[in-house]
Amino acid sequence: MSTDVTPIAAPGAGAAERWRTPLELTLLGAIWGGSFLFMRIAAPDFGPLPLVEARLALGALVLTPFLWRARAQFTSVLWLRIAGIAAINSVIPFALFAWGAERAPAGIGAITNAMTVMFTYLVAFFFFGERITARRLIGLAGGFVGVAILASGRTTGDGVWQAALAGTAASVCYGFGINLVRRYLTGYPSAAVAAANLIAGAVLLAPLAAYTWPARPIPAPSWTSAVLLGALCTGAAFVLYYRLIARIGAPRASTVTYLIPLFGVVWAWLVIGEPLTMSMALAGALILSGVALSQQRAPGK
């Protein structure tokens, strides 16, 4: 990973962004699509809070060198601000999704996570005064329909509604957290901000995680999943996500959550052999079209 980190700055437009943003959103969706599979594997052995602690700590370990380079910028006031945002944007939603992963298939968490887009736009509109254009509303609606098609046929089984409610609550947290990152952490190196967020979250959760840590040994497959969940799906992904928030804004960056269920289905097909259907193909087309439309700027902007 390069140590040349671009500071968070105001969003900018240019010809390169036409390709850069969709590619980065797709990469991030692919990474986060795998996170629910890893949680499904690891959560039964770790338990929700210990798994989240491992995820936060491992992600922080990957990013700490970036924070060390920028440590002079991180005052005590900034650390308090980051701790509050970390609770809303990491600790609580991670714990809710991990709790749900113990009770339902991985796809349920990935599908409910797609509601982050809706909540992010609503928070931005009602609390931060950001406009929602008709073009983006159409794109959001198309993506939402695609997610609904993916969800069809996946809503039965023990614990599904519990997992769905937990995922919805987590998405509300993300909606606020994403906007708070954009509002209060602009101007700092993105990788350093991501590292500080994960460190603060790990410190906040440590007492509860230690108290609930499993007494029995955790098997190797669960540890492998936890390492990938922390280092790749949290550490590396947070850097990319914070850079997107800085460049294109919180609501547009949050549309990546429409891609997560799509990639969750693809990874399930590749890794555990779940079948692909025509409805999934239709859903994928709607999701991709919706995300693309929501990213387009109005003429003259």
Locations of the language-model features?
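Cytoplasmic-side transmembrane-helix entry/capping segments in multi-pass membrane proteins
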Residues: 25, 77-87, 132-143, 163-164, ...
